[in-house]
A protein has these predicted regions:
Chain B
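Short N-terminal alpha-helical targeting/association segments
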Residues: 1, 19-20, 26, 50
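Residue-level signal for the short linker/turn that defines the boundary of a DNA-recognition helix
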Residues: 3, 13-14, 40-43, 54
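Short basic helix-loop element that most often maps to the first helix and adjoining turn
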Residues: 3-22
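Short linear/disordered segments characteristic of secreted peptide precursors
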Residues: 8, 40, 66-69
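Short, charged recognition helix plus adjacent turn
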Residues: 60-72
Length: 147, 72
């Protein structure tokens, strides 16, 4: 019987991570294949009803958030994170206001829907903006430690 | 990467297995390091140096090719 134990060897840990990556790639291909099949046979609605769609979107969002850490590390500008935060917040408020406003137009005056949609867009945009701010702030602090 | 681990290990009378147990890795990893086929982390390099009573540069230092040519 194979004895299962915690891996302590750094080389095997790395190998293990590489194996997980391979499995993840295959799994994603499988999920995409199933979703593509659903799309062809049942149309877009049938595809999005599949719980695998939720899994796919969730992992895509998580991987996008995790890769933000890498994008921030790539930035080499000295600009302050506060300025970036203010600019992105201003743009976000403008965009969510526009979307909310556009939604109130239409056949009937639909103020509630406009507020809800604008609010959802605002919150969805706010989370990544705050996360990027936090990452930039962190890398800025680490940078200033060096000097 | 080339290194002097094998010589240092034999000098202190350790087998690959014994060294592996001392530093907490598998024998295969030690073997791959000796052959220069695995690039260990600095942490593992230090552990190995402590185990064979050598300094980092005695085991892992290699001169730059251009410096070698300049010396000759």
């Amino acid at each position: 019987m194979i004895k299962l134990q915690k891996i302590r060897d750094e080389r095997l840990k790395m190998k293990n991570l590489q194996n997980i990556r391979t499995a993840y790639i295959l799994q994603t291909i499988g999920i995409l294949g199933i979703l593509a099949y659903d799309w062809i046979t049942k149309g877009i609605e049938g595809m999005t009803k599949n719980p695998l769609w939720f899994v796919f979107i969730l992992t895509a969002v998580i991987s996008a958030f995790l890769s933000l850490d890498i994008s921030v590390a790539h930035e080499d500008s000295e600009k302050s994170p506060n300025k970036g935060l203010i600019v992105s917040l201003a743009v976000l408020v403008l965009i969510s206001f526009c979307i909310g406003y556009l939604n109130t137009l239409g056949e009937e005056l639909n103020l509630k829907n406009g507020f809800i949609l604008g609010g959802v867009v605002f919150i969805c945009g706010l989370i990544p903006i705050l996360y990027i701010y936090y990452l930039r702030k962190k890398s800025n602090d680490e940078h200033s430690d060096e000097e | 990467m080339k290194n002097n681990l094998k010589v240092a290990r034999v000098q202190v009378n350790l087998t690959q297995q014994q060294l592996a147990e001392k530093v907490g890795v598998t024998r295969q990893t030690i073997s791959l390091i000796e052959k220069g086929k695995y690039n260990p982390t600095l942490k593992l390099c230090l552990e190995i140096c402590y185990a064979v009573n050598k300094t980092l540069d005695e085991i892992f230092w290699i001169e730059r090719e251009s410096d070698k040519i300049a010396k000759n």
